[in-house]
Amino acid sequence: PLPQAVVSIPGIEYAITSNGAAVYRIQDKQCLRSYVLTEQSVKKILELTKDFPVTYEGFIRGTAYAAKEYIEDPVKFGATEHAVAYVQSTRHLQDDIVSFLKQHDDELDSMDIVVKDEAQKQKVIEVLKAEVEDIYITSSISQLVEISYKDAGKRSGVKFITEYLGLNPKQVAAFGDADNDIDMLEYAGCGIAMENASIGRLA
């Protein structure tokens, strides 16, 4: 669920969640469009990455689930100190996250692979891009490989809302600070990279 401090801001009527996998109308919490990962792709992702020293997160209808060991010590898995409180307050604990993902492989908005360093991250991305066809891969922070259905993405979500409201891209402004914002910023008539963004990638 989105923080009340966000959804209570006047003028914010829609929400794009899970890297564009779902679009909601805030007033009545109606889901206007959603994608889920295919069962086959979830199975492939878990099989291809089982020998990597990683853990996982899964998202179902906007709720995040993660492994007990990750929630207890996010820094051990590459998270920064200032991210600890966020991870621990937003993730629902699962003793066996792999079994959980397998049990819910037909209803995942998206899933994250939590890696320990950039080299491992690039290897995981390389393997997934080569072997799994129907997924969209992006990243918002260094330790995450974020995966959703191939037609998801923030650009896709913003495009849907733009057309739903009868607007055109020139009338859209978007703000972003990470790799998973790039396609959205390119789509918007006014794309703005935040001062703390990875400017080399977003410029």
Name these PLM-found stretches.
Residues 12, 108-109, 132, 188, ...:
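Short, well-ordered alpha-helix to beta-strand connector turns
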Residues 1-79:
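Active-site phosphate-binding/coordination module
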Residues 20-22, 37, 142, 196-200:
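Short, acidic/turn-prone active-site loops that include or flank metal/cofactor-
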